[in-house]
Amino acid sequence: MVSVSEIRQAQRAEGPATIMAIGTANPANCVEQSTYPDFYFKITNSEHKVELKEKFQRMCDKSMIKRRYMYLTEEILKENPSVCEYMAPSLDARQDMVVVEVPRLGKEAAVKAIKEWGQPKSKITHLIFCTTSGVDMPGADYQLTKLLGLRPYVKRYMMYQQGCFAGGTVLRLAKDLAENNKGARVLVVCSEVTAVTFRGPSDTHLDSLVGQALFGDGAAALIVGSDPIPEIEKPIFEMVWTAQTIAPDSEGAIDGHLREAGLTFHLLKDVPGIVSKNIDKALVEAFQPLNISDYNSIFWIAHPGGPAILDQVEQKLGLKPEKMKATREVLSEYGNMSSACVLFILDEMRKKSAQAGLKTTGEGLDWGVLFGFGPGLTIETVVLHSVAI
């Protein structure tokens, strides 16, 4: 008779979880940051708020963002005036948009990832879908299964309302699934649409205005599995270790609340300080077992919640400016896409590493770290090992 331990052994993969493909997608509507304050105050009928507009212009100028992509066009916003007001009841209108657009944008990214992977979609065993945009039953995971034509017995995990740290969460979950289920191939999708958070400006809620200056729409998809099939599946990054922690004394630092007026966003001024104060401890826990204490010797992927967070992390750790190059590039070209951001940065890094003729997918380095920061304040840490190009 076979023992339980023998069964468990047979169920486990041999090697580490590996990212085998990455795909990204954005809505067609591209918004230039330099002209966005004019558009935003006009479409929300707020042009009479001259001082507030000047303040918003300064926020946009300091954001280090050149452009963003948004599902919400001028036409859609004119058809839905309640979405343009500051706190008008508008949840139904927002939900009607995102329950369709979130899985649709997710499909676009997933199709690209599956194509790069090069295997038939029938070999996908698990699906992890993550969004902070809207809630529905059956969920966006179900809708994507239908849109892609996945097998009905794909094992699905739906993560709603997690916020900006969740790009790290999906990697942590995908790692555990791939390593504990031999032959598993996990499709990971993060799809974010700002139709839930868009609203007009308010003199009394400036943190909402910060969100209006930063957030953009995007979806990213990965294929994750252990023991890549030689000559068929090409590894990009290996996931070696993961952790999640709540930063001490950080309650209320980042909050989001789903209300009749949509998803409201609340932010304390000291978020960059809280992140930078706690990042050293997270790094020691992650890299001490590898005997790494020089954080300039690893590659960096950090959720770009905003430029101030990146600046303070660099300053606290004495990081060279080029360490955050891929992160800042994604912030500049797409804005803060919540959970999808770090997956976009993975894609940016492996592409630029290949273009520059470097020896690994991680800017020529062997080891790297991926950080997610979000409500809680929650910090996700993923230790990555690059692959030879």
UniProtKB/Swiss-Prot annotation:
<comment type="function">
    <text>The primary product of this enzyme is 4,2',4',6'-tetrahydroxychalcone (also termed naringenin-chalcone or chalcone) which can under specific conditions spontaneously isomerize into naringenin.</text>
</comment>
<dbReference type="Pfam" id="PF02797">
    <property type="entry name" value="Chal_sti_synt_C"/>
</dbReference>
<dbReference type="GO" id="GO:0016210">
    <property type="term" value="F:naringenin-chalcone synthase activity"/>
</dbReference>
<comment type="similarity">
    <text>Belongs to the thiolase-like superfamily. Chalcone/stilbene synthases family.</text>
</comment>
<keyword id="KW-0012">Acyltransferase</keyword>
<dbReference type="InterPro" id="IPR016039">
    <property type="entry name" value="Thiolase-like"/>
</dbReference>
<feature type="active site">
    <location>
        <position position="164"/>
    </location>
</feature>
<comment type="pathway">
    <text>Secondary metabolite biosynthesis; flavonoid biosynthesis.</text>
</comment>
<dbReference type="InterPro" id="IPR018088">
    <property type="entry name" value="Chalcone/stilbene_synthase_AS"/>
</dbReference>
<keyword id="KW-0284">Flavonoid biosynthesis</keyword>
<protein>
    <recommendedName>
        <fullName>Chalcone synthase 9</fullName>
        <ecNumber>2.3.1.74</ecNumber>
    </recommendedName>
</protein>
<dbReference type="InterPro" id="IPR012328">
    <property type="entry name" value="Chalcone/stilbene_synt_C"/>
</dbReference>
<dbReference type="Pfam" id="PF00195">
    <property type="entry name" value="Chal_sti_synt_N"/>
</dbReference>
<dbReference type="GO" id="GO:0030639">
    <property type="term" value="P:polyketide biosynthetic process"/>
</dbReference>
<keyword id="KW-0808">Transferase</keyword>
<dbReference type="InterPro" id="IPR011141">
    <property type="entry name" value="Polyketide_synthase_type-III"/>
</dbReference>
<dbReference type="GO" id="GO:0009813">
    <property type="term" value="P:flavonoid biosynthetic process"/>
</dbReference>
<dbReference type="InterPro" id="IPR001099">
    <property type="entry name" value="Chalcone/stilbene_synt_N"/>
</dbReference>
